[in-house]
């Protein structure tokens, strides 16, 4: 009996050992083709089937190496993926080692995106048209901040300077219809829909994903025009430390050699802050724990912009049918210069990722942002902003059935008026948002990507701008919304995809609203794709549009309207694209049809100017966009975009300030060797002529009439040039000139109206140095 047991036991051990004996090791080495530098953090997926079902994964180390175990016999298939590179696929033969070289994805068609569907997939396989802009490419191109980068890289986007700061518009829609997200989360602290865009650290961004059109199905009522999602970095290296500094020419020197004895010393000093930036990005990956820390400091000087001629108002017969002919009135006095504020700000962000075991991922994050804004008004005060964000996200996968994600996000923004000479400040604005979210995604059913979710948004605003007088009493207004959404992306076969979904929005103020969406993608071949999309958008009035009532420096009143109704829009688009290894082109035509669109309009009451919010009857926007990318002669890449939009008039009046035509173009040159890289970028952005009407009053024969004068702003082109050199893959030096042909706007406004113009003082040079600290330390250690 004992002998039988021994035989059975030995047989069991032999059976268990057979799989071990049938395995062999294969070592992968992944490097960049042109420089032969190791690619760290490349993901190698392998399986015993060509479709890579039920795969295993490994990640390359600091030397670009990873080892896998494969069967002694039979085929094994692999895929290598790394951000910014073309993926590699192949079959593992009898070799015990493989050295593979990856090439840069200059066409950007293999980027993995999440914004359009909230599920990760390569951009070329997404049913929703998505533009991806790499963060590294923006820094290398010499852009100083996010607004300059988006203006140049995004077709149809217009970022201009107005009285309260920057103003963004896209496809004829202003910032109230463009939802900015950071890692998928909302932000607060906006003015007329515009955030403090200085809070976005360009050096902390991994990529930017832009989805145009009504995206309300997944992102709610603020996404009726577009979604811009800033995805921040997450290091894949054991140690990753980068530090840099950027110096730029001053726009204008307002005060030479200010003395500390001067009564206005702090004002003079703040007005002429240096155009200086510095940053540190540090992270580590220790297996189960990954940390990412980013710190950014920036300052810029204040300057004046001057109008070449006196104010001119042209009252056209088209906008004022009661006139017998066009009337032109020219001011006898010169227009005062327009001041552009200087800023000084610092931002700090921290993310910690913890993966305790295979199916669980935990993220905790927080950030802080402080900004001083220095105007050129000698009133002994300046504006100060403070923002805190914090949140957590937990993701758990139940086998291959479904994945559940729970998150909490909060953003806390304050604005102050601070005294220049004494340590005293007064809070004038407090905004808080809190958003819990729960979602379930599943790929259990073959060909289907399902997502189901529910979220709640609590928005509280405290300000002294609800009173209608100069009492400065702080009051609080709130809006609460609860939303649920469902979406399915169905891959029918290799050629067809369908995405359909619906979102419901409920608030006590405006009741229940449902927003459907459906999108189709047809790929007749691997090079061609067609996309068609319909979606319903919805935007409820903001707290400011409902309740604001304040006097702007005695110049005019800004008045909300508690009778506002939510605006609705129907968005349709049809687009096509073609791509191969060296060429990409896409075109898209769209229509955006609004009902009860919320707009701010000027009203004149006995020469008292009011800016009031109202629902327009309807407004239609028809447009087209084209994007082209061409890589040629191994070293050159040409990029070009064009955007056209036609905005319907309201009773013959054009209140929209968007230019119908906009275009961008750039030519990039890259020369790469093992220990040296050279890159040069020449870029240009074109903005067409703008024509719009502004309400005013006009006296004719002693009788005062409501009237509209026409603003006509000329077309212009801004060009930039930057040259970047990388030495030993450790030190980057960039030299460039912004606005190289020295364009300066000549028309700034008329009357109390300030036009949206590019805030530039002319051609300015900059120098930037960035050091890969961890690579330098590693090199020094090797020498020892």
Residue ranges and their predicted role:
Residues 292, 349-371, 385-510, 521-523, ...:
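Face-selective signature of the C-terminal outer-membrane beta-barrel domain
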Residues 382-397, 429-430, 443, 477-479, ...:
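Outer-membrane beta-barrel signature, preferentially recognizing the C-terminal barrel domain
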Residues 244-383:
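Periplasmic-side early beta-strands and strand-to-turn transitions of outer-membrane beta-barrels
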Residues 244, 491-494, 591-593, 614-695, ...:
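Gram-negative outer-membrane beta-barrel transporters
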Residues 306, 638, 686-697, 724-784:
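C-terminal beta-signal and adjacent terminal beta-strands/loops
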Residues 31-35, 43-47, 81-85, 93-139, ...:
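Short, acidic, small-residue-rich periplasmic hinge/interaction motif at the N-terminus
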Residues 69, 185-212, 230-233:
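Short acidic/polar hinge/loop motifs at secondary-structure boundaries
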Residues 130, 147-189, 206:
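Extracytoplasmic beta-strand/coil segments of soluble accessory domains associated
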């Amino acid at each position: 009996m004992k002998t039988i047991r021994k035989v059975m036991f030995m047989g069991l051990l032999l059976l268990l050992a057979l799989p071990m004996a049938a395995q062999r090791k294969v070592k992968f080495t992944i490097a960049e083709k042109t420089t032969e530098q190791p690619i760290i953090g490349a993901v190698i997926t392998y399986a015993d089937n060509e479709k890579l079902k039920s795969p295993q994964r490994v990640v390359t180390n600091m030397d670009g190496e990873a080892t896998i175990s494969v069967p002694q016999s039979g085929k094994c298939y692999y895929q290598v993926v790394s951000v910014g590179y073309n993926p590699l696929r192949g079959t593992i033969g009898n070799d015990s080692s493989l050295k593979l070289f990856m090439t840069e994805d200059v066409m950007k068609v293999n980027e993995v995106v999440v914004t359009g569907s909230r599920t990760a997939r390569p951009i070329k396989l997404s049913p929703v048209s998505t533009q991806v802009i790499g963060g590294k490419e923006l820094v290398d191109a010499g852009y100083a901040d996010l607004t300059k980068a988006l203006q140049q890289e995004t077709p149809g986007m217009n970022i201009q300077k107005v009285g309260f700061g920057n103003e963004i518009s896209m496809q004829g829609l202003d910032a109230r219809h463009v939802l900015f997200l950071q890692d998928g989360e909302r932000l607060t602290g906006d003015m007329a829909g515009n955030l403090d865009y200085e809070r976005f650290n360009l050096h902390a961004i991994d990529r930017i994903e832009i989805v145009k059109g009504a995206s309300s199905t997944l992102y709610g009522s603020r996404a009726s025009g577009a979604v811009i999602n800033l995805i921040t970095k997450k290091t894949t290296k054991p140690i990753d430390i980068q530090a840099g500094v950027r110096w730029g020419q001053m726009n204008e020197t307002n005060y030479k050699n200010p003395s500390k004895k001067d009564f206005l010393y702090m004002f003079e000093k703040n007005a002429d802050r240096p155009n200086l930036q510095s940053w540190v990005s540090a992270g580590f990956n220790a297996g189960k724990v990954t940390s990412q820390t980013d710190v950014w400091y920036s300052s810029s000087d204040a300057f004046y912009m001057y109008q070449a001629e006196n104010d001119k108002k042209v009252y056209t017969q088209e906008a004022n049918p009661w006139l017998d002919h066009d009337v032109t009135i020219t001011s006898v006095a010169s227009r005062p210069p327009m001041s552009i504020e200087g800023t000084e700000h610092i931002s700090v962000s921290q993310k910690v990722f913890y993966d305790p075991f295979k199916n669980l991922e935990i993220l905790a994050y927080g950030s802080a942002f402080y900004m001083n804004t220095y105007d050129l008004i000698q009133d002994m005060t300046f504006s100060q902003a403070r923002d805190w964000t914090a949140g957590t996200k937990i993701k758990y996968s139940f086998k291959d059935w479904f994945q559940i994600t729970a998150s909490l996000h909060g953003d806390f923004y304050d604005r102050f008026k601070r005294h220049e000479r004494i340590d005293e400040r007064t809070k004038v604005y407090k905004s808080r948002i809190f958003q819990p979210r729960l979602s379930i995604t599943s790929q259990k059913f073959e060909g289907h990507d399902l997502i189901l979710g529910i979220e709640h948004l609590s928005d509280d605003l405290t300000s002294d701008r609800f009173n209608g007088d100069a009492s400065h009493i702080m009051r609080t207004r709130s809006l609460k919304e609860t939303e649920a959404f469902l979406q399915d992306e169905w891959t029918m076969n290799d050629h067809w995809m369908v995405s359909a979904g619906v979102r419901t929005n409920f608030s006590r103020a405006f009741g229940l609203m449902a927003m459907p969406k459906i999108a189709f993608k047809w790929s007749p071949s691997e090079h061609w794709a067609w996309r068609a999309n319909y979606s319903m958008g919805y935007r409820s009035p903001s707290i400011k549009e409902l309740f604001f009532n304040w006097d702007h420096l005695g110049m005019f009143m800004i008045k909300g309207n508690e009778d506002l109704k939510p605006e609705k829009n129907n968005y349709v688009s049809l687009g096509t694209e073609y791509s191969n290894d060296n060429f990409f082109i896409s075109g898209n035509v769209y229509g955006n049809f609004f009902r009860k669109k919320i707009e701010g309009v000027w009203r004149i009451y006995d020469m008292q100017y009011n800016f009031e919010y109202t629902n327009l009857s309807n407004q239609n926007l028809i447009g087209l966009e084209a994007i082209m990318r061409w890589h040629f002669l191994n070293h050159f890449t040409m990029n070009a975009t064009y955007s056209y939009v036609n905005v319907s008039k309201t009773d013959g009046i054009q209140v929209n300030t968007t230019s119908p035509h906009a275009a961008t173009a750039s030519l990039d040159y890259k020369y790469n060797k093992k220990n040296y890289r050279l890159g040069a970028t020449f870029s240009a952005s074109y903005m067409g002529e703008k024509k719009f009407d502004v309400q005013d009053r006009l006296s004719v024969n002693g009788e005062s009439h409501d009237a509209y004068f026409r603003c006509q702003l000329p077309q212009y082109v801004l060009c930039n040039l930057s040259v970047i050199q990388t030495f030993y893959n450790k030190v980057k030096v960039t030299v460039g000139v912004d606005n190289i042909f020295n364009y300066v706007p000549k028309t700034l406004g008329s009357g109390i109206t300030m036009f949206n113009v590019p805030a530039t003082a002319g051609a300015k040079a900059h120098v930037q140095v960035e050091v890969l600290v961890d690579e330098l330390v590693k090199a020094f250690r090797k020498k020892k």
